[in-house]
Amino acid sequence: MIAKTSTISHGANAIRYSVNKEKADIVKANLLPDNISPEAMYGRMMLVQRKFAENINKGRPLGRNVIRIEISPSEEESRGWTMNDWASLSNEFIRVFDSIDLSQKTKRASSKQTNLKGSQYIVALHRDSKSGILHLHIDANRVDMEGRINDSHKIGERAVMAANIINERRGWVQSEEIGIRHKQEISNCCMEIFLSLIHISEPT
C-alpha cells in the first residue's frame, strides 16, 4: 500500500471531485451529516474555521485549508473487500497518521500529532479509470473541532510512515519496495522501446 498527502487551497473542488466522480462510493463522513452535498460539506468545514478564526493563523484565513489524502492498496491486498473493509482501513490509517510524532524532525511542538479523528472529513472510494484498481480519497478539515490546526509540516512524510506501519502490521509490501518495482518496470519498458528502435533502424 502507498499513501500520499498534501494540504490544498482548492478544498471545495477536491471534495466535489471525491464525492461526484463517476462510480465513487462514500465510505464515511466524519463529524458531518450524511447525505449532504459536497458544497455543504466544505461549507461546514469553513464554518468551523471561521468560528476559531481569532485563534488560528493570527485571524487570517488559512490559504491551504484542507488536507488531501490518497490511500492505495495493491489489487492483491484489497481483493474481495467490502465497504466495511475500506472503512476499517480508513479508520486505521487516520489513527496511525494522528499518532506519529514528528516534533523532533520539525523542531515544532505542533508536529507532535495531528487530530484528524477529531476533525471533519469525508472518505470516498474511487476506481482508477484505466486499471480499475480501487483507492481511497480523504478530504479533511485543517482545523479540528476544538479549533486546533492540524500541522502540515512534513505531512507527506507522515503519510508514508503511516502507510509503512500498516503495511508492516498487515504483512503488505512496503511503499519503498513498490517504488523500486515501479522504477524497474519503467526501466524495462524503456529498454524494450530502445531495442525495438534499434531493430527498426537496422538496414534490411
Q: For the regions a protein language model found, what residue spans apply to each?
A:
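N-terminal nicking endonuclease/strand-transfer module with a His-rich metal-binding environment
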Residues: 1-197, 201
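Ser/Thr-centric signal marking residues that sit
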Residues: 204
